[in-house]
C-alpha cells in the first residue's frame, strides 16, 4: 500500500513539475507521454482557428505529439525556406505518405523523388497545352450552364439548394471530362445519387483524423471504428476509379481500331485528356501495377480538380452574400463586359424578362457566348474576389512536410529529423504581420492597383503552394472558377437560408461541414 502511495506521489510530482515548467510556454501545453494530443483532439473540429490563436502572437508553434513533433509556420521567410531554399530537406515524407496512401496512393500529391518528378513532368506538359486549355474552356462553360439551369429552375420554384453539393457535382463532372475523357452525369437535372463523392469525402475525413489519432494503426489492424469505415469507403472509391480507367482505355482502343468512325468530339477527347496521356506513356497499360498507378493519378486529380475548386467557389459565394457591396461591384464589372462587347460588335444589348423562363435562359446563353479565355482575363475584380476568398479560406488550409535531417529555420526554430513542418495558409491569411491591420476583412480591393490585379509573393499567399511544388493547375482552376462565377453572379443574387450553420469540416480540404443552403433570385 505504501509503495503504491509513493509511486502515485512520484507520478503526481512528475506531472506537476512537467506542467510547471511550461507556465511561460507560448505554444500548446503538453502532458507526459501524449504531448499535446489531448489539446489537439479537444480542438479537432476547430483546429485551423486553434492554430490562428497560437500563430497570431508567435509566428512558429511547436506541437509535440506521441510519436513525432509538428512545427507550424506562418512567416513567409520560413515558408520560403521550407518550400524553396531547402526544398530537398522537406519532402512529403514517409509519415505523411503512410497516412494518405490508402486514398492518394503514390500520386503526385503523395510522392517524392523520381516518381513525383515523372508525374509532374507529364502533367506540366499537358497543362501547358493550348489544346487542353481550349478544350477545358468549352467544358467549363458547358457545366457552368448546366448548373445555371438547375439554379434557374430552383429560382422559379423558390426552392432551397445546397450550393456546395451542386458545385461539387459540377467540378467532378468537369474533371472527369477534361482529365479523364469520360462523362459521368452527376449534374444531370435529376441529380442522381453520387456514391463515389460520399465515399471519397468520408475517406478524406478519416485519413485527416489519422494525423492526431495515435491509435489509428491498431484500429486498422483490428478493422474497427473509423478504419473499418475507411476500408468500405475506399472500396467504393476504387470501384468508381477503376471503371473510369477501363472505360477510357476501351475508348482509346476503339479509336485506334476504327479511327475513321470517330466524330470530332471523340477525337478531341482522345487528344486532350490527361488520363489518356498517362496511359499512352505507360510501359504496360494492362498490368496491375499500371492500373494501380493510374488509379492514384486519377484520385489525385479528382482532389485537385473537384474538391479544391468547388470548395473555393462555395466560400466565394458565401463571402459575396456576406458582403453586398462586393456582389454589386462584381455585377457592375460583368455588365461592363456586356456593354463593351456590344460596342465592339456594334450591336444592341438583348432585352429579357426575368419572369419568363425561356427569355431568361436565352439571355444567359447569349452572355455565356461572350466568355472565353481572353474575356475572362479582363475581369480583374472577379479575379480579386476569388483570390481574396482563397486568402481567408484556402482550399488546402495546412500542408505538412517531412524533415529528413536536423535543421534550423531562418527564425532560429530547430527541427528534428523525422518530425514534420507544416505551413498554414489558413492562418497566414489572417495574420496582421502578413497582410496589415485589415487582415481579417474580406477586401478584394487589396489585390488591385488602378483596377488591375496585382499578384502577391507565393510565399505569403500560399493557396497554390510555392517553389518546385507550386500548383500546376492554378490557371485552369482560375479559368473554371471565373467562368462559373461570371455566369452565376451576373444573373443571380444568393441568399443564405436563415439559421443555416456555416463552419468548416476537418479534412484535407476546407469544405463546409453542413453545405451551403441558399435561395436564389434572378437579376435583371
Curated annotation (Swiss-Prot):
Location (main, coarse): membrane
Subcellular localization(s) per the UniProt record: Membrane
Any single biological process term in GO: pollen exine formation
Annotated Gene Ontology cellular component terms: membrane
Phenotype caused by lack of the gene: Lack of exine in pollen grain walls.
Name by which UniProt lists this protein: Cytochrome P450 704B1
InterPro entries: Cyt_P450, Cyt_P450_E_grp-I, Cyt_P450_sf
Spans through the membrane: 2-22
Record's catalysed reaction(s): an omega-methyl-long-chain fatty acid + reduced [NADPH--hemoprotein reductase] + O2 = an omega-hydroxy-long-chain fatty acid + oxidized [NADPH--hemoprotein reductase] + H2O + H(+)
Membrane topology field: Single-pass membrane protein
Disulfides per UniProt: none
GO molecular function, one term: long-chain fatty acid omega-hydroxylase activity
Cofactor(s) in the UniProt record: heme
Pfam family membership, one: p450
Keywords: Heme, Iron, Membrane, Metal-binding, Monooxygenase, NADP, Oxidoreductase, Transmembrane, Transmembrane helix
Gene: CYP704B1
EC code(s) of this entry: 1.14.14.80
Domain of life: Eukaryota
Binding site for heme: 471
Function: Involved in pollen wall development. Catalyzes the conversion of long-chain fatty acids to the corresponding omega-hydroxylated fatty acids. Omega-hydroxylated fatty acids, together with in-chain hydroxylated fatty acids, are key monomeric aliphatic building blocks for sporopollenin synthesis during exine formation.
Family designation: Belongs to the cytochrome P450 family.
Amino acid at each position: 500500500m505504501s509503495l503504491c502511495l509513493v509511486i502515485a506521489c512520484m507520478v503526481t510530482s512528475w506531472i506537476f513539475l512537467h506542467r510547471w515548467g511550461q507556465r511561460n510556454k507560448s505554444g500548446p501545453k503538453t502532458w507526459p507521454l501524449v504531448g499535446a494530443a489531448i489539446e489537439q483532439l479537444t480542438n479537432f473540429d476547430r483546429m485551423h482557428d486553434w492554430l490562428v490563436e497560437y500563430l497570431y502572437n508567435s509566428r512558429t508553434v511547436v506541437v509535440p505529439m506521441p510519436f513525432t513533433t509538428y512545427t507550424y509556420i506562418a512567416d513567409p521567410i520560413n515558408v520560403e525556406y521550407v518550400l524553396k531554399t531547402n526544398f530537398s530537406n522537406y519532402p512529403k515524407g514517409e509519415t505523411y505518405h503512410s497516412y494518405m496512401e490508402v486514398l492518394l496512393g503514390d500520386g503526385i500529391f503523395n510522392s517524392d523523388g523520381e516518381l513525383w518528378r515523372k508525374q509532374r513532368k507529364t502533367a506540366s506538359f499537358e497543362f501547358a497545352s493550348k489544346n487542353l486549355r481550349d478544350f477545358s474552356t468549352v467544358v467549363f462553360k458547358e457545366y457552368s450552364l448546366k448548373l445555371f439551369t438547375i439554379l434557374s429552375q430552383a429560382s422559379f420554384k423558390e426552392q432551397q439548394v445546397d450550393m456546395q453539393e451542386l458545385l461539387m457535382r459540377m467540378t467532378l463532372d468537369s474533371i472527369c471530362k477534361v482529365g479523364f475523357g469520360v462523362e459521368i452525369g452527376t449534374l444531370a437535372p435529376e441529380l442522381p445519387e453520387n456514391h463515389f463523392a460520399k465515399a471519397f469525402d468520408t475517406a478524406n475525413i478519416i485519413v485527416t483524423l489519422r494525423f492526431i489519432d495515435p491509435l489509428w494503426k491498431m484500429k486498422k489492424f483490428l478493422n474497427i471504428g473509423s478504419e473499418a469505415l475507411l476500408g468500405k469507403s475506399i472500396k467504393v472509391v476504387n470501384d468508381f476509379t477503376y471503371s473510369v480507367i477501363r472505360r477510357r482505355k476501351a475508348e482509346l482502343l476503339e479509336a485506334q481500331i476504327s479511327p475513321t468512325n470517330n466524330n470530332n468530339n471523340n477525337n478531341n477527347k482522345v487528344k486532350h485528356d490527361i488520363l489518356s496521356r498517362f496511359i499512352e506513356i505507360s510501359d504496360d497499360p494492362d498490368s496491375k501495377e499500371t492500373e494501380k498507378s493510374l488509379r492514384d493519378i486519377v484520385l489525385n486529380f479528382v482532389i485537385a480538380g473537384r474538391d479544391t475548386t468547388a470548395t473555393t467557389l462555395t466560400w466565394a459565394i458565401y463571402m459575396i452574400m456576406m458582403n453586398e457591396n462586393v456582389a454589386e461591384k462584381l455585377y457592375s464589372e460583368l455588365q461592363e463586359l456586356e456593354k463593351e462587347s456590344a460596342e465592339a460588335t456594334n450591336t444592341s444589348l438583348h432585352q429579357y424578362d426575368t419572369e419568363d423562363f425561356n427569355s431568361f435562359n436565352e439571355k444567359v446563353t447569349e452572355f455565356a457566348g461572350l466568355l472565353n479565355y481572353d474575356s475572362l482575363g479582363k475581369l480583374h475584380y472577379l479575379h480579386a474576389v476569388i483570390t481574396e476568398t482563397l486568402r481567408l479560406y484556402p482550399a488546402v488550409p495546412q500542408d505538412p512536410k517531412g524533415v529528413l535531417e536536423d535543421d534550423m529555420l531562418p527564425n532560429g526554430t530547430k527541427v528534428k529529423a523525422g518530425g514534420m513542418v507544416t505551413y498554414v495558409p489558413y492562418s497566414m491569411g489572417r495574420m496582421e504581420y502578413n497582410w496589415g491591420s485589415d487582415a481579417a476583412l474580406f477586401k478584394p480591393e487589396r489585390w488591385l492597383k488602378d483596377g488591375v490585379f496585382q499578384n502577391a509573393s507565393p510565399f505569403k499567399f500560399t493557396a497554390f503552394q510555392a517553389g518546385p511544388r507550386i500548383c500546376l493547375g492554378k490557371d485552369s482552376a482560375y479559368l473554371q472558377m471565373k467562368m462559373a462565377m461570371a455566369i452565376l453572379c451576373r444573373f443571380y443574387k444568393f441568399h443564405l437560408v436563415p439559421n443555416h450553420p456555416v463552419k468548416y469540416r476537418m479534412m484535407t480540404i476546407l469544405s463546409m461541414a453542413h453545405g451551403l443552403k441558399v435561395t436564389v433570385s434572378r437579376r435583371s
